[in-house]
Amino acid sequence: MATLVANITLQMTNSIDLVRSTAVRLLVEVENGSRLDGLLDTDPFVDARDRRFLHQLSAGAIKWRDRLDWIINSFSKRPVKSLAPEIRQVLRLGTYQLLWLDRVPERAAVHSSVELAKYLEHSGTGGFVNAILRRVIAEGRNVAYPDVVNNPVAYYATMYSHPRWLVSRWLDRWGAAATEALLQANNEVPPVYVTLADGTADHPLPASFGTVEVEDRPGVFRVTHPEGLFDDPAFLAGWFVQDINASLATRLLAAEPGDQVLDVCAAPGGKSMQLAAVVCSGRVTATDISQQRVQRMRENMLRLQRQQIAVVVEDGERPAAMGPFDRVLADVPCSGTGVLGRHPEARWQKDAEDLRRHSDRQLRILESAFARLRPGGILVYSTCSLEEEENDTVVDAFLARRPDASLEPASVHFPGMAWSARSVQTLPGRDPGDGAYAARIRRLLPGQSRSA
């Protein structure tokens, strides 16, 4: 069956919709552990409209998976999880189009789903899919959900389609209002932000992209009409994509002209480019464990002419002998719970045990990075996680081991900001942009104490 689905795009009949059949294939692969963005990079479509529709279908069905399953199970005698993987995705896609995409005619959504089911199995399966989707049209908007008072975890997890273990911990930490806003933000189409590689406006983007500079984020612009952006000569000459909050870590690091800076786990390289624009005659050493990601960084540095950046393949847990550095940025691998809106499949591919595995590795990387920082220098530890185990807990464990390390409150550098106190923590739904964490740590001079 899986082979059959994989060959849909190669063995088409007139009755099978190419975009929707490809979406089924992608969804099956994502459910088996693949990343959606990697699959979309290899999709066969040249037409921009088809590419956008494929992305919309795939990302939407993934984000809303559990709510879609709840709706389908309300009308099916066979639980969704008991169905063949391909038929499960056909039903999810059909239901998503009927209830979320107003511009898709009901007839087109039902007909394409039925034809796909018949192609994948037989006419009887097509009849089963047709019956379910007809019920969805008639009653899908009136389905009863778990009671928010008696079972808030089940309610929020189902209504906003997130894993229950994650919803439970967020409710405990953030409360109902902030958690609901966070869940809702994760299901919205994430905005596109771009940053100037050198902090100057020598390569302004055409007005058709609708770029607007973000308040309190110098050099960061929101792109309201991003179609065609990545092929535009002005973009290629001086811009890169980066979330509004990605620059918070580099601003907290506060590198200065002439500094020698180490950027650990640097891919895709946006922070390195920001740092290079600041250090001028200094140097940025950007490291990453992945040869493929390092090659992509090198291509971006060449495109944007950032000669003061050296890109090195390196394991952050077992670094080479380099340094000491004036500034170190350790933007460590994490669970990514702050960027679930940009990676819809990630919410279904994680569990609570991932947090422990990440935190152990994060502490090792932090210790290795700090060892290459000169006395008196500054290190910023950052993640795109919302979880305390990966953020303050890691920093506290590190400080307990290193009496020559001192935490400097982030509020000094971001006064008056609700997301800035002991450390930086932005929260989607409460704050613009992705979830981001950053803590500023100074390496004390010999004989200096934390109270000094």
Residue locations for each model-derived region?
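S-adenosylmethionine
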Residues: 1-452
